[in-house]
Amino acid sequence: MDKAQRYLTAGTRENTRKSYRAAIEHFEVTWGGFLPATAEGIVRYLAEYADSLALSTLRQRLAALAQWHVSQGFPDPTKAPHVRQMLKGIRVVHPTRQKQAAPLQLRHLEKAVNWLNSKAADAVESGDYRALMRYRRDAALLLIGFWRGFRSDELARLQVEDTQAEAGIGITFYLPYTKADRDHQGSTFHTPALKKLCPVEAYINWINVAGMTRGPVFRKLDRWGNLSEKGFKSTSLIPLLRRILEEAGIPAQSYSSHSMRRGFATWASANGWDIKGLMSYVGWKDMKSALRYVDASNSFGGLAAFSPGRIDHDDPESSS
């Protein structure tokens, strides 16, 4: 790979490159299409898979085909009016409700963290260092994931050397890039220390027991308690989250890695955060992205039987 190609490749996310390659292969090999394509060919391709693939998947396939044509210097057939009309028709004939992760409710977060802290105390008493590391790590993962609203890939990319935590004050994370930071300018995220369910305390507890000074914040532990040098893969966080919640006695099948992010957004909305403050804190750049995570906050006041953003005693304090 020459220098120019190296930088051109670096300008596109690895996951995007993989998904685009898979989309082009599906068009050429699975369906038998030819590149460069015509708008009529794109329409036939969409018609073939309209009833078997989600509209979001079809849009991703079109994005890949568009990128291929533009990068090769050909006109983009996906922008043709009848291709857009075809997408509209698919949406009408095959209406689907957009799937959303269930928000992790604050009461479930509290129950899981209390269980983890109790198990950590038992591990200290019994001298089980491996178990102590696991419970400290899992508590930090839950609390940082919830209160910062990080995506799974962002949690997986957190580095100890780019994190500063001060007990009773707050914690600051730096990420070289995020999904919203398309120009890779880097972003800094701050969260204050809380009176309870505190991500700062959980992080410090985890770092101290693990003895880490550099490298990924969240890593695998083997059966003997040895800490991996490599960080979690983002895809491993969903089964890990579900395992933690299940072990704490919380039904977890409806939860995904987005549940912590959506849970925080639900809590913040219920506690008076305006949408601009929430967008700034989490890092959303457009309103549409933010609103996908926030449940409508119509208040029924004291008549409401249950509020997902409230627990029975004093809520943790946070600020935007």
What are these regions (language model features)?
Residues 1-320:
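Extended, non-catalytic subsegments within catalytic or DNA/protein-binding/adaptor domains
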